[in-house]
């Protein structure tokens, strides 16, 4: 019996499946992560703006959406790296704006950014962003951005890093 439990645990760890997350499309441009309780923007900034952005522009985008009370709320924020990692779906069913397969659950919209900014800073001049293709962490100068870096806003209590 102990061997069987150990075998199941080893397969679970090796495959990286973990416990399946459950997401609900709220029908108002948001998705609820029923495991964490976080509320996510269903699309991302690229869907709306058709451009990438640097970290400072990402903060401005969130401030604008809060002033507009996106989906009825004014407490949206950039996610932490851990929060973005928690969304990762290794089957990569969603496609980015460039057609690359990315690791978002199918309840999220295809056609968005490949990389998403996080609230996490690295020193004074850099901030972290997350690659949805293969669950990659990167950092860049805050004032630099390219066509692939965007924002997927979240609200709720931040995950600790």
Segments predicted by a language model, with ranges:
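Bacterial N-terminal signal peptides
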Residues: 4-16
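Extracellular adhesion/carbohydrate-recognition regions
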Residues: 19-76, 150-154
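An exposed tryptophan-centered "aromatic clamp" motif
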Residues: 59-75, 81-131
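Short solvent-exposed loop/turn micro-motifs enriched in small/polar/acidic residues
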Residues: 22-25, 109-110, 146
């Amino acid at each position: 019996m102990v061997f069987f439990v150990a075998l199941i645990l080893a397969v679970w760890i090796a495959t990286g499946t973990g416990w399946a997350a459950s997401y609900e499309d709220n029908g108002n441009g948001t998705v609820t992560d029923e495991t964490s309780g976080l509320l996510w923007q269903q699309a991302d900034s690229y869907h709306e703006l058709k451009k990438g952005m640097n970290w400072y522009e990402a903060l401005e985008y969130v401030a604008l959406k809060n002033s507009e009370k996106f989906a009825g709320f004014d407490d949206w924020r950039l996610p932490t790296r851990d929060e973005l990692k928690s969304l990762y779906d290794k089957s990569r069913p969603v496609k980015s704006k460039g057609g690359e397969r990315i690791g978002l659950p199918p309840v999220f919209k295809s056609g968005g950014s490949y990389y998403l900014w996080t609230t996490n800073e690295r020193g004074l001049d850099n901030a972290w962003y997350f690659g949805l293709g293969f669950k990659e962490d990167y950092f860049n100068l805050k004032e630099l951005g390219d066509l692939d870096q965007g924002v997927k806003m979240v609200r709720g209590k931040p995950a600790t890093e």
